[in-house]
Curated annotation (Swiss-Prot):
<keyword id="KW-0999">Mitochondrion inner membrane</keyword>
<feature type="transmembrane region" description="Helical">
    <location>
        <begin position="113"/>
        <end position="133"/>
    </location>
</feature>
<dbReference type="InterPro" id="IPR030689">
    <property type="entry name" value="Cytochrome_b"/>
</dbReference>
<dbReference type="Pfam" id="PF00032">
    <property type="entry name" value="Cytochrom_B_C"/>
</dbReference>
<feature type="binding site" description="axial binding residue">
    <location>
        <position position="182"/>
    </location>
    <ligand>
        <name>heme b b562</name>
    </ligand>
</feature>
<feature type="transmembrane region" description="Helical">
    <location>
        <begin position="226"/>
        <end position="246"/>
    </location>
</feature>
<keyword id="KW-0830">Ubiquinone</keyword>
<dbReference type="InterPro" id="IPR048260">
    <property type="entry name" value="Cytochrome_b_C_euk/bac"/>
</dbReference>
<dbReference type="GO" id="GO:0005743">
    <property type="term" value="C:mitochondrial inner membrane"/>
</dbReference>
<keyword id="KW-0472">Membrane</keyword>
<keyword id="KW-0679">Respiratory chain</keyword>
<keyword id="KW-0812">Transmembrane</keyword>
<dbReference type="InterPro" id="IPR036150">
    <property type="entry name" value="Cyt_b/b6_C_sf"/>
</dbReference>
<feature type="transmembrane region" description="Helical">
    <location>
        <begin position="77"/>
        <end position="98"/>
    </location>
</feature>
<feature type="transmembrane region" description="Helical">
    <location>
        <begin position="33"/>
        <end position="53"/>
    </location>
</feature>
<keyword id="KW-0496">Mitochondrion</keyword>
<keyword id="KW-0349">Heme</keyword>
Length: 379
């Protein structure tokens, strides 16, 4: 009798995706972040669902409904902080996952890579709209400033911003539609994640060496399921440490003040995971001139496969490219720090230097070093 997991139509799909899936025998802990992102998504959907049961998307009651969740709902404070800090861990896993893709040359799987970029943009949009929902000072002013960036688009910009707002300023219509989109987008992300996995399983997974591994594969279960469970335990530990000991560590104190359109906070900034892009935006003292590099900070990812000049896929055996990659990684925390600082000297200058540095590494130095490395091994 055939095993049910190999004969049942639904169980067979699960079996081929998570149990009998042939996986390279040498993939490292950097390949754990895909499964961790799946866990983060499930966690965010579940905690978000419970929060939505008590949340009111009206400008008059939104702030007090969040207060009510924290004070009066059973374990409401825990659900709220799990959702907020879960988003931070989601982005940490996302950045690690993308970084691994760049380091080991996973971007050569073009369909998987492009769906991944679409996923990243959708998650960023979802997180931004979620930040607006508590209707604190930073929620209101963050929404005003970030949506206003679209007014830099020639001719249609102003109309586009007012269409998104649903009026002439961020108000009740904006909050209601942001809540609706914030609720539906995680389900769209789930569908995109399924497509991402579908394309990945068409080609098979990459591995640290960047070489074909068809001759050396092992079943996903039990080897990598155990490995993923270990990663999950570390993720839960990090989340619980944040939620139970420092729930507001990654938040903004201004968001504990109800939104007031008549009082601008001294320093408007988005959540920490957007600060690197925000620093690039502020480094150019021109609206359109700042918006274009700001957009390119993410939209450079689809261009990376075109800039791949090396005959080796992975950076693992390319010392010059390794130096450039780790300098790039070191530059991102600097940009994140600058994005959270006031717009004054010396932060403006540091931000400008870091922005030029990141673009020169990605657009020029990495491709040049790829060619140099080809010649150094006489390829």
């Amino acid at each position: 009798m055939t095993n049910i997991r190999k004969s049942h139509p639904i169980a067979k799909i699960m079996n081929e995706s998570f149990i009998d899936l042939p996986a390279p025998s040498n993939i490292s802990a950097w390949w754990n972040f895909g499964s961790l992102l799946g866990i983060c998504l499930i966690l965010q959907i579940l905690t978000g669902l419970f929060l939505a049961m008590h949340y009111s998307s009206d400008t008059m009651t939104a702030f007090s409904s969040v207060t009510h969740i924290c004070r009066d709902v059973n374990h409401g404070w825990m659900i709220r902080y799990m959702h907020a800090n879960g988003a931070s861990l989601f982005f940490i896993c996302l950045f690690m996952h993308v970084g691994r893709g760049v380091y080991y040359g996973s971007y050569t799987f073009s369909e998987t890579w492009n769906i991944g970029i679409l996923l990243l943009l959708t998650v960023m949009a979802t997180a931004f709209m979620g930040y607006v929902l508590p209707w604190g000072q930073m929620s209101f002013w963050g929404a005003t400033v970030i949506t206003n960036l679209l007014s830099a688009i020639p001719y249609i910009g102003t109309n586009l911003v007012e269409w998104i707002w649903g009026g002439f300023s961020v108000d009740k219509a904006t909050l209601t539609r942001f809540f609706a989109f914030h609720f539906i987008l995680p389900f769209i992300i789930s569908a995109l994640a399924a497509v991402h996995l579908l394309f990945l399983h068409e080609t098979g997974s990459n591995n640290p060496s960047g070489m074909m591994s068809d001759s050396d594969k092992i079943p996903f279960h039990p080897y990598y399921t155990i490995k993923d469970i270990l990663g999950l335990l570390f993720l839960i530990l990090a989340l619980m440490l944040l939620v139970l000991f420092s729930p507001d560590l990654l938040g903004d104190p201004d968001n504990y003040t109800p939104a007031n359109p008549l009082n601008t906070p001294p320093h408007i900034k988005p959540e920490w995971y957007f600060l690197f892009a925000y620093a690039i935006l502020r480094s150019i003292p021109n609206k359109l001139g700042g918006v274009l590099p700001h957009a390119m900070s993410i939209l450079i990812l689809p261009i990376i496969p075109m800039l791949h000049t090396s005959k080796q896929r992975s950076i693992m055996f390319r010392p010059l490219s390794q130096c450039m990659f780790w300098l790039l990684v070191a530059d991102l925390p600097i940009l994140t720090w600058i994005g959270g600082q006031p717009v004054e000297y010396p932060f403006i200058t540091i931000g400008q230097l870091a922005s030029v540095y990141i673009s020169s590494i990605l657009l020029x130095l990495m491709p040049i070093f790829g060619i140099i490395e080809n010649h150094s091994v006489k390829w």
